[in-house]
Amino acid sequence: MPGNSLGKMFRITTFGESHGPMIGVIVDGVPAGLYISKEDIEFELSFRRPGKQFVSGRREKDEPEIVSGVYNGRTTGAPLTIIIRNNDVISSLYEEVKHKPRPGHADLPYIMKYGYENWDYRGGGRSSARETASRVAASAIAKKLLMLTDTVIGAHLKSLGPVELDEDVSFREIFCSKYSPVRASKKWLEEKYEELIKQATVEGDSWGGVAEVIADNVPIGLGEPVFDKLKSDLAKALLSIPAVVGFEYGLGFKASKMKGSEANDEIVIKDNGKLGWRYNKAGGILGGLSNGEKLVLRCAFKPTSSIRKPQKTVDLRTSEESTIRVIGRHDPAVAIRGVSVAEAMVALVLVDHALRSGYIPPVKLSEDQARIIEEKWRRYVEECKPMQESQ
């Protein structure tokens, strides 16, 4: 099964299944000398961890173990391997799924491609969103390296079902939404999201949503024309997330309904004396290259496919139509935890391109660089907590 790797100079390869003994990721291309700890990785994992209110009841601790590529707390330049053991597995909940593929899931396509006898039906196997914990673990390394370019990434749930944020929101509010149980950037929005989720849970149904990711201080010129454009790699990374059904940046699909005079952004001299764009309608990307403005992109998540409502399917034992009610532990809105995954994927793409463009040394960090990264990382971990508590 190829297709488990992403990136060129900063390359990740994930492995493992939802109900296997572990999942994990191999990260190749990490410069030597970076301080990295279990706690750094746990910090990022904590925001997508299941078992919280409004998400899956599967209670995984998500404790990462660094098993290669680090010595005395610093990267060696060798491939860095992280494993996360699966501890809260109840495969018996999926016995019916073994014979009745779930509507909206990858079950039937996997059976058709790899064969029924080779299909790991337990929790979705390799197609499960459980795999994304490995990506988030790798993103901790990516985000630390991006401290060298002062790039900071924030993400929030812009809409859930029929409820959508229709007012301006600051980058700070977006950044701090990671402390909201539903990844809302406004308190009123959080309350409306929670109402929707409670309603869906009672009805045995689910909701879809849209995650918005903002990256500030993105270096100019990231992207390699023509097939490795920044937008192309971001689209690939975000569309690889389970349940993501759409991607846009800047004006996105709205631009298709505009005139050129409306969609074009005026070039101006900014307050700092540098050239820039008046409104950032392009979302930080023009010609497939980052242009120095904030990176603004969105990805749409479909509703969680595993729902308790009866749905039509086929019993593979009898080849007759049947029904199924999925009784496992599932998110009423996969988009909530998907926000953290979308943020992680953007970090992975940006660090890969930053290495390719020479903004980050590819072989070894200097002592000053390693120290600066560590200092900025500590501020990143601590800085938004007081603001969140005051909201």
Curated annotation (Swiss-Prot):
This reaction introduces a second double bond into the aromatic ring system. NADP(+) binds at R48. Pathway: Metabolic intermediate biosynthesis; chorismate biosynthesis; chorismate from D-erythrose 4-phosphate and phosphoenolpyruvate: step 7/7. The keyword Protein transport does not apply. PANTHER family: CHORISMATE SYNTHASE. Pfam families: Chorismate_synt. Keywords: Amino-acid biosynthesis, Aromatic amino acid biosynthesis, FAD, Flavoprotein, FMN, Lyase, NADP. Reduced FMN (FMNH(2)). This is Chorismate synthase. Its cofactor is FMNH2. GO terms for molecular function: chorismate synthase activity; FMN binding. The keyword rRNA processing does not apply.
